Amino acid sequence: MRGRLGTSIVCILVFSISLSAESMASDSIDEAEERGFKVVRTIPLEETSFTQGLEVRNGSIFQSSGLYGSSRLTEIDLQSGNIIRNMPVNDSYFAEGITVLDQSIIMLTWKGEQAFRIDISNFSIVENFSFEGEGWGICFNGEFLVMSNGTSQISFRDPETFEINHTIQVTWDGQPVPNINELEC
């Protein structure tokens, strides 16, 4: 199981895989782009948060927190760090990655083979999608929902139907890179 240590957000972007149109057009990339970060401030989180997904939009932090029986989606005020609202997730699901898509949040489940479209204004589930395998990380690249599943495969899914359009394999020196998780588009 992938553990998360600490109870505060130190920085939002620790590691990312950039999927630009240019890099997707080529079959291989010789060298990954190195990016830095700067800690601007920290925001304390609840001790029980097991952060799986994190998005910042319009002055709010949207956080999915996983664990069977206590998974939830939380909106946190970016300035004060106060919780605006929580949406508990059914106890049978382990919440995973999230991404903002228009006026909704797409949230994956780890082994539940479900993704939920959640109305961002009231945190109600408006649609659910079934998929095969595990859900780990997700982002929206402007055209597709880009999803990882803990393997070396990344799928590009239709944002309306969640159907797979195509997949790519992440490799390093010709070898598959397993455990691809968090994605930033």
Annotate each language-model stretch with its function.
Residues 28-47, 81:
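A short helix->beta-strand "capping" segment at the edge of beta-propeller domains
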Residues 40-72, 88, 92-99:
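Beta-strand-rich domains and repeat architectures in extracellular enzymes and scaffolds
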Residues 49-53, 93-99, 133-140, 177-182:
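Repeated scaffold domains used in trafficking and secretory/extracellular systems
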Residues 81-117, 125-135:
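Blade-loop segments of beta-propeller domains
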Residues 62-68, 105-112, 147-151:
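Conserved beta-strand positions in repeat-built beta-propeller and related beta-rich domains
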Residues 58-59, 102-103, 142-143:
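Short coil/turn segments that connect the beta-strands within blades of beta-propeller domains
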Residues 42-47, 87-91, 127-132, 169-175:
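Surface loop/turn motifs at the tips and blade-to-blade linkers of beta-strand repeat domains
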Residues 77-81, 119-123, 159-162:
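Short loop/turn segments that connect beta-strands within beta-propeller blades
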